Amino acid sequence: MDSKITKYFLIIFLINFKVLAVEFQGKFIQGHYIIGKTSPGAKILIDKKKVKVSKDGYFAFGIGKDRKFDIVITENEKKIIKKIQKRKYKIQRIDGLPEKKVTPPEEFYERIKKENLLIGKAREIESDLPFFKEKFIIPVDDAIITGVYGSQRILNGIPKWPHYGLDFAQKTGTPIKAMNNGIVTLAENDLFYTGATLIFDHGHGVSTLYMHMNKIFVKVGDHVKKGEIVGTVGSSGRATGPHLDIRLNWFGERLDPQSILAN
């Protein structure tokens, strides 16, 4: 009789333990995007920072491009420590750019500063939208990937910031699809570096950027559906040819877009 009671309580404990255990989707690699699943109502901290948890227990976070130390996830009072796998990034050389777009003249500094603030504001939005946990799709059909995340860019022989996006080369005018459901939080036709640019909010601090477009078909506040045509491929801003440069952000953390397409 005692053994049956013991077995009963052991089963109950294991069931509860499974419910409380955090599950992760994604790889703990530099630059990657992670989706977590916990019990509804649980409190989650990422490196002591509280993150939003959806009503059904989902949350999201990102791992920085050059992060070298472990990441600490706290579920209620339980700590989970994950080691981060390092990556080796490529070197990419791009020649033939107009000199003013490699090293912009001083008269453009104020404009660039204002545009960076505009983009930064859109990236810091923390909404309750649930789309961050859904599958993302490739935005351009039959494209060639010509630039990857993390590559060190040497522009006209001058070392510059790493590339934080994923480039899809296609003909000017090729349709661009929304990678996921979301709300348009930025729609600008002529930013200095990125040209015609869109930002979509997918919820919980997760946003995607579309850059160097030719035409934009949506406006700020529009609700877009996954697969909807939102514009066309172009070469606006600082670009040497027609392509779409996509970015993935978790708030201010710039992540590898391939990590959401892989998920």
Please tell me what each predicted stretch does.
Residues 83-194:
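Surface-exposed, glycine-biased beta-strand/turn segments
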Residues 179-214, 242, 247-248:
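Zn2+-dependent peptidoglycan hydrolase active-site motif and core
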